[in-house]
Amino acid sequence: MMRNLKTFRALALATLLATTASAGSAGAVDISLLRFFGECNTEYGTVTDISKANGECGIITVLTNKFNAENTLGAKVVTQTVEWGAYYDQLTATYSTGNIPDVAVMHASVMPNFSGRDLLTPLSGPLKELGIPSDDFVPAALKNATANGEIYALPFDLHALLFHVNMDLMKQANMANPDGSPMLPKSADELIAQGKKFKEATGKPFIASESQSAEGMMVRFFDTLMWQQGVDVVSADGKAASIDTPEGLNAAKLISAIYSEGLANPALDYPGSEQAFLNGEAGILLNGTWGVDNYDSQAKSGKAALKSYRVANVPQLFANQKVWADSHMWVIPKDENRSAEKTKAAEAFLKFLYDNNYEWSRTGHLSVRQSVLDSAAFKALPHRNEFAATATNATALPQVQNQRAVYNAMITDLNAMWLTGTEPQAALSAMQAGVERVLRRNR
């Protein structure tokens, strides 16, 4: 595995040097990078050894440092970090202020809002010139980055919802299989039954999840349950919603019961849900692939109450094995005033990120490169075999505009079931009406 890993990193460095050397005419130039993933310069501000980085913030920070230290263009990436919730409003505002970033991170679910308004630089040609083969991208990732036959983004990952599991607590509740894996439910009724059994045995909530209307973690779970029943929340043309349906009521009743039966703490925000899990206060954390590296490191450190950590695909509770997913991608926002030198440097940075996609996959995200997924180094990463099926089960809303607005419209009304006692049917009706208002923009 170490030989394979060293080969990955050597190839990445060699390609960086070759790429930047061939673009040497660009000269020394600063380029701006707008991103979320947090700020961690105190820990990683001067680190260039990627093997010492962990987590999303650590890995992207060190990758940026490494590019700045090693590229032969003399290019320097200057990073501006934005809090996740405000990110897309701030990115949109840059088109009015003129401070358009040279590179920006973007979710696949948001890209249609920008590509549909001609706000992104087409990348099919540049990626080909940089030697990035489109056939190395897994189909779902390439689809996410494409609109009307043109590639507008460099895919960076597929990320999805997972069950993060405290196996010590599961064993305490007699909910561990002989092979050491967690005993997970196979139906909605079984999930509630297991949750009650777990709570009785441990005195703790079965599930920890962000529940305070900021992240909308349960909206992702609701979408998952809808897809598992064969229903798309939004139609393929982005003009109709299918929320207030029998399938929607099944999903809403299950989520409502998780809270009404005391199987989850409704007071937890996102950091609180993670802390509860790390403190050994819940059996399962409902969160994404992005947490795997962090939780594994914390469990191994001996400093957290969480000691025995495992990962599981979100279980199939209905007819189909599906799970909510999205992608992080990198774009070059369109700017008619950007110099050729800045464009070359931005493209070189994208090539560097592509070459180091394995490093990003250490976060827990699934690589978008088939060559990385097939590698021994990737397969040897902690827990990857435990959620391998997620790559196949990953499902997203159609590539239509206003996906993020649909998501936001659902959060408040769904969360009202446990925050204000709204009945599931009333929550469904409100979600349907709210999403329909958003989708009128697509007509």
Give a label for each model feature.
Residues 309-314, 361-416, 441-442:
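Long, aromatic- and glycine/proline-rich binding clefts that accommodate carbohydrate-like moieties
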Residues 124-137, 180-184, 206-214, 229-250, ...:
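Short, solvent-exposed loop/beta-turn-alpha elements that line the ligand-binding surface or hinge
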Residues 190-197, 236-267:
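Glycine-centered hinge/linker elements that transmit conformational signals in sensory
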Residues 171, 202, 350-372:
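Periplasmic-binding protein-like
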Residues 24-113, 135, 318, 426, ...:
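Conserved N-terminal structural module of periplasmic/extracytoplasmic solute-binding proteins
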